[in-house]
UniProtKB/Swiss-Prot annotation:
It comes from Proteus mirabilis (strain HI4320). SUPFAM superfamilies: Tetrahydrobiopterin biosynthesis enzymes-like. PANTHER family: NADPH-DEPENDENT 7-CYANO-7-DEAZAGUANINE REDUCTASE. Pfam families: QueF, QueF_N. NADPH binds at residues 90-91, 257-258. Belongs to the GTP cyclohydrolase I family. QueF type 2 subfamily. Keywords: Cytoplasm, NADP, Oxidoreductase, Queuosine biosynthesis. Substrate binds at residues 88-90, 228-229. The gene is queF. The active site is at residues 189, 196. This is NADPH-dependent 7-cyano-7-deazaguanine reductase. It is found in: Cytoplasm. It catalyses: 7-aminomethyl-7-carbaguanine + 2 NADP(+) = 7-cyano-7-deazaguanine + 2 NADPH + 3 H(+). GO terms for biological process: queuosine biosynthetic process; tRNA modification.
Length: 281
């Protein structure tokens, strides 16, 4: 998108550039992206956000050496609060985690402390982190968003350019409280334009939203270039702008890349996100 072109924060990223893998711990590999880059275009300010929320990351490829040199593995769960100044750029996150591979740590607690310290410093805000042994996940089933899937509609689409106007005039006077789900969300990385595949849950209370128009709107992200977190905030903003629901939650879970998946959520009401893996995760 042209509104990001020339921004120094993006030009400094390792994303889209040839990089070397570091096998010893290096916190400087982490890179943050100011959330304001997207929020300025939506007229959102840090001191008056219309939502709360977080960016939930799952770290599947985390390994280090114990004090005897024996490799250790874990799966990590990280959540950045939506109020952090920066989001974490995913390639830098991957490179940072790889730097643990040949580094010795005395115990798991020190690894957790190190990760939390570095991610908090990069995000410039509140971060929660927990490491789990692999056994923690062996009995966890694949789940699905609970809601009505809107994907199987007999409609024809031939335009895949982003257009928020699909939501204009999309409500009726019927008041509802419902949860809608689509697995057709696809956008592209802001820098590399690599595809990002996701499922999205939209939970709202207010005037009924036309499901065909909502699906056309979501499909219009198909050639849109933004980070995962930015797309979710844009969806939240556009639904609030055009549909004016009393309450709204938008929660997307994306497929993993480089051993990481990103699952942003934004809400203006009480909401606790389920963190179970979806079928494509």
């Amino acid at each position: 998108m042209s509104l990001y072109q020339g921004d120094k924060a993006l030009e400094a990223l390792s994303l889209g550039k040839e990089t070397q893998y570091h096998t010893h711990y290096d916190a400087s590999l982490l890179q943050g992206v100011p959330r304001r880059l997207n929020r300025d275009s939506l007229s959102l300010t840090a001191d008056n956000l219309p939502f709360h929320g977080g960016d939930i990351w799952t770290m599947y490829e985390l390994s280090w050496l114990n004090s005897q040199g024996l490799p250790q593995v874990a799966i990590g769960h990280v959540e950045l609060d939506a109020t952090t100044e920066n989001l974490i750029e995913s390639k830098s996150f991957k490179l940072y985690l790889n730097s643990f591979n040949q580094t010795r740590f005395e115990n798991w607690h020190i690894v957790e402390e190190t990760l939390l310290k570095d991610l908090t410093a990069c995000a410039k805000g509140r971060v929660h982190l927990t490491l789990y042994p692999l056994s923690h996940f062996t009995s966890q089933p694949i789940v699905d968003f609970v809601g009505e899937c809107i994907d199987n509609q007999p409609i024809e689409i031939d335009n895949y350019q982003f257009d928020s106007q699909w939501l204009n005039g999309s409500t009726t006077d019927t008041l509802v409280e419902e949860t809608l789900v689509s697995h057709l969300l696809k956008s592209n990385c802001l820098i590399t334009h690599q595809p990002d595949w996701g499922s999205v849950m939209i939970q709202y209370k207010g005037k009924k939203i036309d499901r065909e128009k909502l699906l056309r709107y979501l499909v219009s992200f198909r050639q849109h270039n933004e980070f995962h977190e930015q797309c979710v905030e844009r969806i939240f903003h556009d639904i609030m702008t055009f549909c004016s629901p009393d309450t709204l939650t938008v929660y997307a879970r994306y497929t993993r890349r480089g051993g990481l998946d990103i699952n942003p959520w934004r809400s203006n009401c009480e909401f606790v996100p389920e963190t179970g893996r979806l079928a494509r995760q």
